Each structure stands twice: as structure tokens, then as C-alpha cells.
């Protein structure tokens, strides 16, 4: 499989009480504009040049004749340039909870053959039992109101030797760092912590018998503060920061730069469950 080194994901979790509220999620992902801002900062400043999306995809191990379902496909960028992989699939279904995001995925992958597009809620997947070899759900499980119901639906979809690939964030990465810079009270026990690298294995083991955790080593080295200001203002769920004027955000970031660089820790990874 050929990978684009700038591929990235960022459905950045935000410590909002609405993170797993259906309408809040629909609003956050109704258009691709804010998501693209968050994707861009990773593409531009990540120290790991493989790209998080490429790293995730390298663990799918899609073989000839496999059926694949992605839940929460976002803009579809994960599949751009992957025609060879798509051709291997006997069936590839890309789905999202948001109509607007699914429209963007169709636009991104216009001209690609062999892809089905569906609006799907993970809690009520409209397929029969044992239909897929691989089910994918990246950076979205913390949005699911009834996570265990969603995971049971995924398990129902999988063939006997199928696997579930799901990427998520850790509790000590970008958001914790940004909140610390601005002295915002950290709500680590809220809905944003419902599926993390720290607690995800336990949640998955309630449904799956074999769970593996993989960690992605990375950070941001930001040299243009304006890009970080844009990033912060794209965080729909963090009104305390998003509503601050740019002129109040900028000096806080500049104060924490060293040698013209703002070092931002990242904590991302994925689980593979069977």
C-alpha cells in the first residue's frame, strides 16, 4: 500500500458536556471547514512524518476479497490515493453520522470506483450479522452515547476471524496541554474521557476477547503561532477558548515558545480488537 506522508486525522475531542450528544456532534461535523483546520496543523507541524492516518492504515492489513466497513469516515482523506487497496476489497462501505461530512467524503473520492456511502449510527448498524472482515472507527468512539451498544453492534458485524480497528487519543496530549496554558479547569472525568488510550482496552474487553493497544509517537513543533490560534478557535466544544479574541490567545502561545517553536505534546494510538 502506498501512503501519503501528509495523511492525518483529527476529530479532536473537546471537553464539552455535549461530546456524546447526537445534536452537538452533528453540529461539530456538519461541515468540513473546522475539521480541515485541525487536520492541517498535524500535516504541517507533526514531528512524525509518517502521518497518523498512514500509520493507522498500515495496521488494517486489507487483503484480496475482504469486506470493509468504516464508521465515522469524515472527509474520506484516509482513502485518497489508495485505489489499489480499494480494489482489493470485495466491498467497501464508508459511513458517517453526519450527512454533510459524508457529502465531503464523496467529493474527496469522486471518481473512485467500488465505494458505497451510507449515513450510519454505530448504535444501529443496518447490516446483517457477520458481514465484514474489518470494521474501522477512528477518533469517534468518544462521541457515542451508548458505547457498549455500539461496540456490540460492531462485534455483530464482524465475521468469525474479523477485526475491529479503532484509533483514539490519550488523556495527556494536546487538549491537556492547551488547557494548562490558559489555566482552564480540566474536566478529565467528563464525556470526553469516555474512550481513551487509558480506558479503551477495558471498554473493548467487555465485548471482545482479544484486544491489542498500539501507540503512535508524535508531537507538534509549531513555528507560526497564527496556525495554532486557528486550531484553538476551531474547537467547537471549548467555548472558553474559542470565544477569546485572537489577540488574547496569541501572546499566551508566544510566551511558551522556545527558540521560535511551540512544542505541543500529542498522545494518539489505536486498538485492534477481535
Descriptions of predicted regions:
Residues 133-147:
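A short SAM/SAH-binding and catalytic strip from SAM-dependent methyltransferases
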Residues 67-124:
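Class I SAM-dependent methyltransferase SAM/SAH-binding core
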Residues 148-160:
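A short glycine-rich, Lys/Arg-flanked "PGG" loop and its adjoining helix->strand segment in the class I
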Residues 123-135:
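A short acidic, Gly/Pro-enriched loop at the edge of an enzyme's catalytic core
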Residues 3, 42, 48-49, 75-77, ...:
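Conserved Class I S-adenosyl-L-methionine
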Residues 67, 161-163:
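Short glycine-centered segments of the SAM/dcSAM-binding site in methyltransferase folds
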Residues 2-64, 77-81, 101, 165-191:
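Conserved class I S-adenosyl-L-methionine
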Amino acid at each position: 500500500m502506498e501512503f501519503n506522508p501528509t495523511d492525518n486525522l483529527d476529530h479532536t475531542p473537546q471537553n464539552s458536556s455535549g461530546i456524546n450528544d447526537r445534536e452537538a456532534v452533528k453540529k461539530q461535523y456538519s461541515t468540513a471547514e473546522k475539521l480541515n483546520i485541525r487536520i492541517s496543523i498535524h500535516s504541517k507541524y507533526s514531528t512524525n512524518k509518517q502521518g497518523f492516518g498512514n500509520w493507522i492504515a498500515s495496521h488494517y492489513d486489507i487483503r484480496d476479497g475482504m469486506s470493509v466497513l468504516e464508521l465515522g469516515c469524515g472527509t474520506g482523506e484516509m482513502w485518497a490515493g489508495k485505489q489499489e487497496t480499494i480494489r482489493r476489497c470485495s466491498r467497501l462501505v464508508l459511513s458517517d453520522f453526519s450527512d454533510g461530512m459524508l457529502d465531503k467524503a464523496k467529493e474527496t473520492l469522486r471518481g473512485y470506483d467500488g465505494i458505497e456511502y451510507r449515513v450510519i449510527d454505530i448504535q444501529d448498524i443496518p447490516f446483517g450479522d457477520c458481514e465484514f472482515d474489518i470494521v474501522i472507527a477512528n477518533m469517534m468512539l468518544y462521541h457515542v452515547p451508548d458505547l457498549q451498544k455500539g461496540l456490540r453492534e460492531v462485534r455483530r458485524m464482524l465475521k468469525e476471524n474479523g477485526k475491529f480497528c479503532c484509533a483514539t487519543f490519550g488523556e495527556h496530549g494536546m487538549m491537556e496541554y492547551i488547557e494548562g496554558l490558559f489555566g482552564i479547569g480540566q474536566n478529565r472525568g467528563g464525556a470526553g474521557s469516555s474512550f481513551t488510550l487509558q480506558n479503551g482496552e477495558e471498554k473493548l474487553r467487555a465485548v471482545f476477547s482479544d484486544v491489542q493497544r498500539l501507540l503512535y509517537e508524535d508531537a507538534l513543533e509549531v513555528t507560526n503561532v497564527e496556525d495554532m490560534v486557528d486550531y484553538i478557535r476551531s474547537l467547537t466544544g471549548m467555548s472558553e477558548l474559542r470565544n477569546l479574541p485572537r489577540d488574547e490567545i496569541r501572546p499566551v502561545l508566544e510566551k511558551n515558545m522556545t527558540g521560535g517553536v511551540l512544542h505541543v505534546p500529542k498522545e494518539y494510538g489505536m486498538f485492534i480488537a477481535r
